[in-house]
UniProtKB/Swiss-Prot annotation:
The lineage of its organism: Eukaryota, Metazoa, Chordata, Craniata, Vertebrata. Residues 1314-1326 have a biased composition (Basic and acidic residues). Component of the gamma-tubulin ring complex (gTuRC) which mediates microtubule nucleation. The gTuRC regulates the minus-end nucleation of alpha-beta tubulin heterodimers that grow into microtubule protafilaments, a critical step in centrosome duplication and spindle formation. Keywords: Cytoplasm, Cytoskeleton, Microtubule. The gene is Tubgcp6. One of its GO terms (cellular component) is spindle pole. This is Gamma-tubulin complex component 6. Component of the gamma-tubulin ring complex (gTuRC) consisting of TUBGCP2, TUBGCP3, TUBGCP4, TUBGCP5 and TUBGCP6 and gamma-tubulin TUBG1 or TUBG2. TUBGCP2, TUBGCP3, TUBGCP4, TUBGCP5 and TUBGCP6 assemble in a 5:5:2:1:1 stoichiometry; each is associated with a gamma-tubulin, thereby arranging 14 gamma-tubulins in a helical manner. Gamma-tubulin at the first position is blocked by TUBGCP3 at the last position, allowing 13 protafilaments to grow into a microtubule. Belongs to the TUBGCP family.
Length: 1769
């Protein structure tokens, strides 16, 4: 047996109820309740244990009969004032005894048990009120005592003594009151005499001044001090005093001056002191009182007027009840029993309150009964409380009953379906009912938290607004009283699915300004949850989850296996054509976009599984209904981040349509420029040849004229001599003398002639030498112009040699570089442009030739003064563009003429890149490909302005001055340096290593440029080298990646020596890998104007070489279509002052260098990291300074790069670079991790770099030793911390090398420059890109160089590695969190919090809320829903992510179809071939067909595959586009095989069609119906071709007849020529109209439409409209059939005309009319019919155009009636 304490403990545990959490109430403290129960138990135990002896000696009550005991109990009840209970007890006992078939055998025993149990029940609440004034709601009221049944008196009647004393007190009190009334002054106590209280006591001055004054409402009702000033309550400062300008007096004294008020009494200052009335003598007033003649409740001192009668209720409850009974009795008596009023049932107010609270929860009670058929609560008739009528109570209770009815109906409506049964109403309805249950739970919490001590009116007031909401929700759900009242009409079915969302949205819009709005918003948000999840899955991943078929889309699985347009049109279909049936109203305008978006993603998954949309791990913004301001901002931010990241992925993963078009336009412009250059070269050659021929002809003519002139003179002299001889023959002496003189004269003439001939020979030699020089100069010019042709040849030769080299290297050891020949390149420049400023500069040395590495560099011979002047003169001539003076000098036979290497074809670069990706382990020379530097050529900077004319190669005009201004105090050094040329040039050529060819004109961006410019600018200077320069390595290594850090250049005095590694070969040639020592004092040189290059400008930077240099303002940078290569101002020297770099340019692939890098004096040993080659540009476009004391550089404003920052390479410039380091550089590439926003610990050195994904960009940290000058572009970080960046694709790489560096964060660059939001700064970058944790600085040395990492123990390394793996796994798990689709909405049924609609109730009546419960909605949600309209909220929360993703998907689909699938080329192929835009193809095809047709071949002979295929292949050979890949898609097809070809039928070949094969997925756009339309147009065009062929054949026959039969003069022949001409005009008009409208106008409209298409549906629609327009304008529609019939008839007449012409031969010419044709009358008749039809067609088309139908026919009218032929006739 357990102890007493244990038993009591168990008893208390059993009695305590189970702990239940009741919303709105504090939880019951079980310990306290248990303690109180124990106290009761022990009190009962001890009360029975320790009793007095007197109480123990009681008469033995067990001997009394049980009935007597019951009667004793009933007597106790009557004594206690419970008469009805006593009567009820006696009545029940009598019934029990009188019952004949009582089931209980021992009735007495049962009654005895009940008697023993009497008084042992729980104490009643009201019985504790032992004091009349304790907690009495009537305290303070003057209420007369009621009868026996009044509970308030029954409290006293429990004790007889107290009852008697109370009666005595009452009598005494009544006597005292009567005496006081008789003895008191007149008027005292009058307002309270009797039952009525008038409430208007005017007995004394105190009452008048306080309660009866005008401002009585503004003061307290009682004042205990006569001197208290009554004033207005305090008013806040912000109150509006405009209505208080005039103050009303506080009291108007009626005795002083009744009826008259002066104006001064109403002024505010006159009322500052209230006037007090004097006391009157009451007895005098009573004696002199005269009653007013007016019948009113007028008293002394009261103003006259109507007074209200007092309310009956002021007489007290008892009086009201009696009066009600009296009136009811009167009605009964008057009606004679006709009016059966319900019997009044008096109920305690506490019971009514309890029943009311129960019925609010749907609980039936005695007061409220439930009507089962209508599911409504009904108030029992006659229920009332004391002091109120049944009708008034019934009106209050009926409202409460209505609330309970609505609650009950809503509870039934929102019941969850049975688990396991299918809910046909869908998920949206389930979500709506769960939201409704949540609201009802909140409502229950409000009811349960209401204390039962409130009055009925308070409860009715508190639940008024909640009741209105319940009533509204019942009406909303169709279960309200109004809905059920119209039972005659069929009830509308409650909407489900998207219609329910539209219904809720419309209701929310209609109720946006009342109290139901927040509840509707809550229900709308809950109901939208399943739909937004469906939309989320469909839009983002194309997943279709619709269990109940309630959403917009229906899946046809059989069509999903199709691979044509049926997959697109029938695989996923909308459930209805009405938009409202498919989507909610608020998504109506983007319903189609959402539908197409999911279809597009599924199509991309099917066609291109590797598309970035299918595998992208960028987190998507959520789609949900949001009313919170913070969440809305988060959504908008997430959308912006998502769009930015996806666009970055898109730019990296594929080429966009716009980029492709831009590239094509650039290539087109380049082609145009090259063509123009070629044309100008050919024209100049022609003009030169013509000029040379003209000069030669002129010379020949002059020589011939000179010969004729000499002959004439000689002949004249001979005649004169002959005449003289005749005169002198007579005299012999004279003859002899003449003979002697003649001989002497002949001798003199001979001598003179020899002298003249010698002089002529001398000057002819001089002129021939001059002519030869001129020819040589012209030859040089011509050679220079043919440079590009030579260059192509040499490039191909060089490729062959390089392939031979590779083969030889693979077979035998590498030979010295000098063995292999290689083409050289030259850097040409014009003469010095500052020569006119007074400084002498020998132009003979303005060019350095970097020849073939296999040949020694030939020394440049000195140029005589005349050659120099000639070069200067030629510079001003028309041929001076880009010439060098050495072009006019003779070239040694052994010296190979240098050429300019303009680049490597893009295909070779791509192949090399692919090879480098496929072979990660390769020999050293081929390990790194040229992909990094050369990819910059194929990439285009979309932010630059397209200047194709400037971006291409040489223009014929003279160059403009692009040289930098040179300080005048430095220019005198030019003359000094020119004197050193002869002494140093030979040494320099010996000591300089044999240079390899310059790389093609695009230098490696920025970092490659300084050395390239250095060499180019050195070509204009005399370079003095130190004596020890000859000790350098004879040749430099050739690096395929062409990295700048491969060069070992000595500049100035203070650079340390570098041991050169063994030289290596380079395929493409680097410009700056020679070991060049430059002397101390280098003069400044104004660089020559560099050549333009289509692949990028090569020298836009100001470079200074030397020790003491002054400032240089950099020249304006040039645009480059492949990205700018030199935005950095680079200074080389010892003391270099500041340079402000030019503004960097934008690049679509990201700017590659925003860091200002300084290289200091003392640089220690650095092992360069293995740089990762980059597809999108080089790694260093930076402002780099080399020298001893380098001042600061103000960095340009940094630009963000969508592909990541690429200028973070770990590049160090140091002293001792070992072979191992360069091998590292040759072999592979490592990449340090990328930065998030804060520095992370440094990476471990020995971790292998992970493979970089395609979107990754080479990024490394560029830095120098800590001893170098600090960067000014950011705060200095500690040496132990190094920022690392995490890539945007969740993969990281560990750098193989770290440096002690001071790195500037990009956000801190510059002073006062605002930080731009970059891709690395996004909020969820941490989730996307888990960075590997890194170790400290000491652990980061490479294995080749000793460092502190050797001292770290293995255990610490293992611990660090384990920690890194754990951190990596943790970050990886954050990436992949599974998002489950919830199929149960239990969370929505959890107990809600009362904050949901807390702003609807006044704060004084708000329900108590547990402060520990957090609010369900954030506070800004309520404010936001009040500030913004619902459409705006839905647009910002739902439309923003949807619109963002839909636009991304649509653009991706458009880019995929246009770029990957080349859709536009298919459209062009269809236009070329099926629409016969390619005239060569159409002409040859039609000629071949019609020739065989005209030859009389049968259908079996013509329409067989062999013949048709040969015809098609021949036509394609003639075609301009026959070699395109799409030409293979063409084939002939037969619709049917005719038995014979109908004669004179224009559609004789309608059985033949030209088919175009379209593969999946292009057949979604180019469908079978589209191909049929193409075929119809082709058929009509073939008819036109038949007409043209027919007319050509007619013309041929007429011409042959005219030639053979000589019928040209025949009259009939002339007539037939005119007939043919008119027919030809008609056919050509139709052909021109079709070509213009279909081939040109419709195509241009189609192209314009394609330029702006947004998604795949629009492409499909645009193509269908294009074809429809072509068919419509080609008159091939059914409505245009009458017009087409006329045209067919005309065509038939043309064919008939031909057959009539060729069927018979011409007759002989018998008469004056000439030859005649036998069928001429028939042909004349055919022509007449043709003319009739053509005029009729003209009239029909004119009417169509005038009516406005088919306005495009105006073109046809204009063509056919251009000279008003038809109109006039």
């Amino acid at each position: 047996m357990a102890s007493i304490t244990q038993l009591f403990d168990d008893l208390c545990e059993a009695l305590l109820p189970a702990a239940q959490a009741r919303p709105g109430q504090r939880s019951v403290n079980r310990k306290r309740a248990k303690r109180s129960l124990k106290r009761v138990a022990y009190n009962a135990l001890f009360a029975n244990l320790f009793q007095e002896d007197t109480h123990q000696r009681q008469p033995d009550s067990s001997k009394l009969p049980v009935k007597n005991k019951v009667l004793m109990l009933s007597f106790d009840l009557r004594v206690g004032g419970l008469g009805p209970e006593a009567d009820r007890l006696e009545e029940l006992v009598e019934k029990l005894e009188a019952a004949p078939d009582c089931p209980f055998v021992e009735v007495a025993s049962v009654l005895d048990l009940l008697v023993q149990l009497a008084g042992s029940g729980p104490p009643q609440v009201l019985r504790r009120k032992r004091d009349y004034f304790f907690n009495n709601k009537h305290a303070g009221r003057n209420i007369p005592y009621s009868g026996y049944d009044c509970y308030d008196l029954s409290v006293f009647e429990m004790d007889v003594r107290s009852f008697i004393s109370g009666e005595e007190n009452l009598c005494h009190h009544t006597v005292q009151e009567a005496l006081q009334v008789m003895e008191a002054a007149p008027g005292t106590g009058l307002p309270t005499v009797g039952l009525f209280s008038i409430g208007d006591s005017c007995g004394d001055r105190f009452e008048r001044d306080t309660r009866v004054s005008l401002f009585g409402a503004l003061v307290h009702s009682r004042t205990y001090d006569m001197d208290v000033r009554l004033d207005l309550p305090p008013v806040p400062d912000s109150a509006d005093f405009s209505g208080l300008a005039i103050k009303v007096p506080q009291i108007v004294d009626q005795w002083e001056d009744e009826g008259f008020q002066s104006a001064s009494n109403l002024t505010p200052d006159s009322q500052s002191e209230p006037s007090m009335t004097p006391d009157l003598d009451l007895w005098e007033a009573v004696l002199t009182y005269e009653a007013s003649k007016r019948r009113c409740w007028e008293r002394i001192g009261c103003p006259p007027g109507h007074r209200e009668e007092p309310y009956l209720t002021e007489a007290g409850r008892d009086a009201f009840d009696r009066f009600c009974r009296l009136r009811h009795g009167e009605l009964q008596a008057l009606s004679g029993g006709l009016l059966q009023a319900p019997k009044p049932v008096l109920v305690e107010e506490s019971e009514l309150v309890k029943d009311s609270l129960n019925v609010l929860l749907g609980v039936v009670s005695a007061t409220f009964s439930l009507c089962r058929p209508t599911q409504a609560f009904v108030v029992e008739p006659g229920v009332h409380v004391s002091g109120a009528s049944p009708e008034s109570i019934s009106s209050i209770l009926s409202e409460v009953a209505e609330y309970g009815t609505c609650y009950t109906r809503l509870s039934h409506f929102s019941l969850q379906p049975v688990v396991g049964s299918l809910c046909s109403r869908g998920l949206v309805f389930q979500a709506f009912t769960s939201g409704l249950r949540r609201y009802l739970q909140y409502y229950r919490a409000c009811v349960l938290s209401t204390p039962p001590t409130l009055s009925l009116l308070t409860i009715g007031f508190l639940f008024k607004k909640l009741g209105r909401q319940l009533r509204y929700l019942a009406e909303l759900c169709g279960v309200g009283t109004v809905s059920l009242a119209t039972s005659g009409e069929p009830r509308a079915v409650f909407p489900t699915g998207v219609k329910l969302l539209s219904y809720l949205y419309q209701e929310a819009l209609d109720n946006c300004s009342n109290e139901h709005y927040p509840v509707l918003l809550s229900l709308l948000k809950t109901s939208c949850e399943p739909y937004t999840r469906f939309i989320h899955d469909w839009v983002y991943s194309g997943v279709f989850r619709d269990v109940y078929g309630e959403f917009m889309i229906q899946v046809n699985h059989e069509y999903l296996s199709f691979r044509d347009k049926f997959y697109w049109t029938h695989g996923y279909v909308l459930i209805s054509k009405e938009v409202e049936d498919c989507v909610p109203v608020f998504l109506k305008h983007i319903a189609h976009d959402v539908y197409v978006c999911g279809k597009t993603i599924n199509l991309l998954k099917l066609c291109c599984p590797r598309h970035y949309l299918c595998w992208s791990d960028v987190p998507v913004p959520r789609i949900s209904v949001i009313f919170s301001l913070e969440e809305l901002k988060e959504i908008e931010k997430d959308c912006a981040v998502y769009v930015g990241r996806m666009e970055r992925v898109a730019r990296h993963s594929c080429i966009s349509k716009e980029e492709k078009e831009l590239r094509m336009e650039i290539a087109k412009q380049e082609l145009i420029v090259h063509a123009r250059e070629a044309a100008s070269r050919v024209l100049s050659e022609l003009s030169d040849r013509q000029m040379a021929e003209q000069i030669a002809q002129d010379t020949r003519k002059r020589e011939q004229f000179q010969r004729l002139k000499e002959q004439f003179v000689k002949d004249q002299e001979r005649r004169l001599a002959a005449r003289q001889e005749e005169l002198d023959d007579d005299f012999s002496y004279a003859r002899e003398l003449r003979d002697r003189e003649k001989r002497l004269k002949a001798l003199e003439e001979e001598l003179e002639r020899k002298a003249r001939q010698a002089l002529v020979d001398h000057y002819s030699k001089l002129s021939a030498e001059a002519a030869r020089r001129e020819q040589k100069a012209l030859w040089r010019i011509q050679r220079h112009r043919l440079e590009s042709a030579r260059l192509r040849f040499l490039l191909e030769d060089q490729k062959c040699i390089q392939e031979m080299l590779r083969d030889m290297e693979a077979q035998q050891p590498q030979e010295p570089p000098s063995v292999f020949p290689s083409t050289g390149s030259q850097v040409t420049s014009t003469g010095p442009e500052h020569a006119g400023e007074g400084h002498s500069c020998d132009p003979g040395f303005t060019e350095l030739h970097w020849g073939c590495p296999s040949l020694p560099c030939a020394s440049t011979p000195s140029v005589p003064k005349s050659a120099t002047e000639g070069a200067d003169d030629s510079g001003a001539g028309p041929f001076s563009t880009g010439l060098s003076i050495t072009d006019f000098l003779p070239v040694d036979s052994g010296e190979e003429q240098p050429v300019e290497n303009t680049g490597v074809p893009f295909l070779e670069v791509a192949l090399q890149t692919i090879c480098s990706d496929l072979s990660p382990v390769a020999p050293e020379p081929a390990a790194l490909t040229a992909g990094g530097p050369q990819a910059t050529q194929s990439e285009y900077d979309f932010n630059t302005i397209l200047r194709p004319a400037m971006a291409t190669s040489l223009s014929p005009g003279p160059f403009q001055d692009v040289q930098n201004s040179v300080d005048s105090d430095k220019q005198h050094l030019l003359g000094d340096m020119s004197t050193k040329v002869d002494s140093y040039i030979h040494d320099m050529q010996e000591t300089l290593p044999c240079p390899h060819p310059l790389s093609h004109a695009t230098p490696v961006e920025g970092s490659l440029q300084p050395v390239g410019q250095l060499l180019e600018h050195m070509s204009e200077t005399t370079v003095s080298t130190e004596s020890h320069a000859s000790g350098m390595a004879p040749c430099q290594q050739l690096s395929i990646s062409r990295h700048v850090s491969d060069a070992n250049i000595k500049v100035g005095d203070y650079m340390s020596d570098v041991a050169l590694p063994r030289p290596r070969w380079n395929v493409h040639g680097h410009v700056s890998e020679a070991s060049i020592g430059v002397g101390e004092n280098m003069a400044e040189v104004a660089p020559s104007r560099p050549r333009w290059n289509v692949h990028g400008h090569v020298s836009d930077a100001s470079i200074k070489i030397g020790e003491n240099m002054s400032d240089v303002a950099p020249s304006r940078t040039r645009w480059n279509i492949h990205g700018h290569v030199s935005d950095a101002s680079i200074k080389v020297g010892e003391n270099v002052s500041d340079v402000t770099p030019s503004r960097p340019r934008w690049n679509v692939h990201g700017h590659v260098s925003e860091a200002s890098i300084k290289v200091g004096e003392n640089v220690s040993d650095v092992t360069p990291s293995r740089p990762r080659w980059n597809v999108h540009g080089h790694v260093s476009e930076a402002s780099i300074k080399v020298g001893e004391n380098v001042s600061d550089v103000t960095p340009s404003r940094p630009r963000w790069n969508v592909h990541g920052h690429v200028s973070d390479a770990s590049i160090r410039i140091g002293e001792n670079v070992s072979d191992t380091d360069l091998d590292l550089q040759q072999r592979g590439c490592a990449q340090p991790p990328l930065i998030l926003e804060e520095p992370l610990p440094e990476a471990e050195a020995d971790l292998k770099p992970h493979q970089c994904p395609p979107a990754h960009v080479s990024e490394a940290v560029l830095g120098v030793e800590a001893q170098s000058p600090a960067l000014e572009c950011g705060p200095q970080l500690p040496e132990k911390t190094k920022p690392t960046v995490c890539s945007g694709f969740g993969r990281t790489e560990e750098g193989s090398l770290q440096t002690k560096t001071l790195v500037a964060e990009p956000s801190m660059l510059g002073s006062g420059i605002p930080e731009e939001k970059g891709p690395g700064k996004s909020r969820d970058a941490e989730d996307l890109s888990p960075c590997l944790p890194s170790s400290s600085q000491e652990d980061t040395a490479v294995p080749s160089s000793p460092g502190p990492s050797d001292e770290v123990s293995n255990t610490e390394a293992e611990a660090r590695r384990w920690g890194k793996e754990q951190a990596y796994l943790t970050d990886l798990t954050k990436l992949y969190h599974l998002e489950q689709y919830p199929d149960s909405y239990d969370s929505m049924s959890e107990p809600p919090v009362a904050h949901l609609v807390h702003h609807m109730l006044p704060r004084a009546f708000a329900f108590p809320v547990d402060p520990q419960v957090q609010s369900a909605v954030d506070e800004s949600a309520v404010q936001l829903s009040e500030l913004l309209t619902l459409p705006v909220l839905m647009k910002r929360s739902l439309m923003a992510p949807l619109a963002a993703h839909v636009s991304l998907v649509s653009k991706a689909a458009v880019d995929y179809f246009f770029v990957e699938l080349h859709l536009e080329t298919h459209f062009e192929a269809l236009r070329h071939f099926l629409l016969m835009e390619d005239g060569e193809f159409a002409q040859s095809l039609s000629d071949l067909l019609f020739e065989k047709l005209g030859a009389g071949q049968t259908p079996g002979e013509l329409l067989n595959p062999l013949v048709l295929n040969s015809i098609l292949s021949k036509a394609l050979q003639y075609s301009l586009h026959g070699d395109t890949p799409h030409a293979s898609n063409l084939s002939f097809a037969l619709k049917y095989l005719p038995e014979v070809f109908a004669p004179n039928a224009p559609d004789v070949l309608s059985c033949l069609e030209l088919r175009y094969k379209v593969d999946w997925p292009l057949n979604i756009v180019i469908t079978e119906s589209c191909l049929n339309k193409y075929s119809g147009i082709f058929s009509f065009l073939l008819q036109l071709k038949l007409m043209m062929w027919t007319l050509k054949d007619i013309c041929f026959h007429l011409k042959r007849t005219a030639l053979v039969s000589h019928t040209a003069g025949s009259v009939q022949f002339r007539q037939l020529q005119l007939f043919k001409h008119e027919m030809q005009h008609f056919v050509k008009v139709i052909q021109g109209y079709i070509a213009n409208q279909i081939l040109h106008v419709s195509w241009c409209e189609f192209r314009a439409r394609l330029a702006v298409v947004g998604d795949l549906e629009e492409i499909q629609r645009a193509h269908a409209e294009y074809l429809h327009r072509a068919v419509f304008r080609g008159l091939l529609t059914e409505k245009a059939a009458p017009v087409m019939n006329i045209i067919h008839s005309i065509f038939s007449l043309v064919l008939k005309f031909r057959s009539q012409l060729i069927s018979q031969n011409w007759g002989p010419a018998t008469g004056p009319r000439g030859a005649e044709h036998p069928n001429f009358p028939l042909m004349q008749q055919s022509y007449s019919t043709f003319k009739y039809y053509s005029h009729f067609l003209f009239k029909v088309v004119t009417k169509l155009v005038n009516r406005g139908y088919q306005p495009h026919l105006e073109d046809f009218l204009l063509r056919i009636n251009f000279n008003n032929y038809y109109q006039d006739s």
